[in-house]
Amino acid sequence: MKKRDQAIGFLVVFLAAGMLISCGRSREVEQDAEARVEEAFTGNGITDFEKMDLSAYEQQTGVALVDDYVSYHFFYESDGLAIEAYLGAPRELLEQKKPSDCLIYNHGGNRDYGALEGVETTFYAYQYQTICVASNYRGCGKSEGTDTFGGQDVDDVIHLVDLCEKMPFIDGDHINMLGVSRGGMMTYEALRADDRIHRAVVVSGLADSFMEYEERDDMKEVYRELVGGTPQELPEEYEKRSATYWADQIDTPLLIFHTEADDRVPIAQAEQLAAKLKAAGKEYQFISDGAGGHGELSKEDVEKIRQWLLE
């Protein structure tokens, strides 16, 4: 199955499950959603953007996405590079006077494998009833630059936080973050570097690059190419990409999910990180599940995340 088909398939399953709250409540409209987004873009120097057509996803899911949701594809600047990004949001949250919570989603994969294709932000916006923003890190999708797998590309996440803070419809004190797989590593590094994130969720997150390199033969080439060498040659670079080595520097409340059967990022990484967070007296929750594979969540997990983000 192609990645795009998989993405749409996951969207269909979650949306059709009826787990989500309708956006059809009456509201006092501050400004048309599209006008507000586009005004915010241009006001922040973003001129390369386009509204996305959600009709195909609406037909797939049977949910009124076109009427109730707004989605945009755009490019923003990070270290002089044009970075591809997406915004998805309930129309209601964009049009109300009060700024809303926001969720920055950090995707998994490397280079073009796992690149965002547009449906993800709408998926999370619907699933968690929030404004969702996500980017294809440098060297991924249509973004400029080179993927460094947790190196300078973390700046792309930080600069997305900068952008979200400037959006009038986003509450800068309630910018949350969700990272899956490699996106978990990106999330941990962003939390270490920046204390503006309100709450964070990591699913099947890469927390120890030393362990990942040793335990997955298929990742050795990825690390050598994108990081620049082996753990023996570049221990500082691998430590930078290993939250287990600096858990005491993470101050954002964390919710961590990992399945015992994960064959891409062994659960031992999450267990070690949880132990380090506990020893450092950090606020966190670690939830492990015997069922499911890499990046998978149960309905109960989804509800747990929704409640966690509301706190």
Label every PLM stretch briefly.
Residues 148-168:
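Alpha/beta-hydrolase active-site loop
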Residues 115, 210-246, 252:
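Mobile cap/lid helix-loop segments that gate and shape the active-site cleft of serine hydrolases
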Residues 94-100, 105-145, 210:
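Short substrate-entry loop that stabilizes the transition state in hydrolases
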Residues 250, 256-258, 262:
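Short beta-strand/loop motif that positions the catalytic acidic residue
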Residues 51-96:
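N-terminal cap/lid segment of alpha/beta-hydrolase-fold proteins
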Residues 271, 278-311:
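C-terminal catalytic histidine-bearing segment of alpha/beta-hydrolase fold enzymes
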Residues 170-181:
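Alpha/beta-hydrolase fold nucleophile elbow
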Residues 184-195:
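Short glycine-enriched nucleophile-adjacent loop
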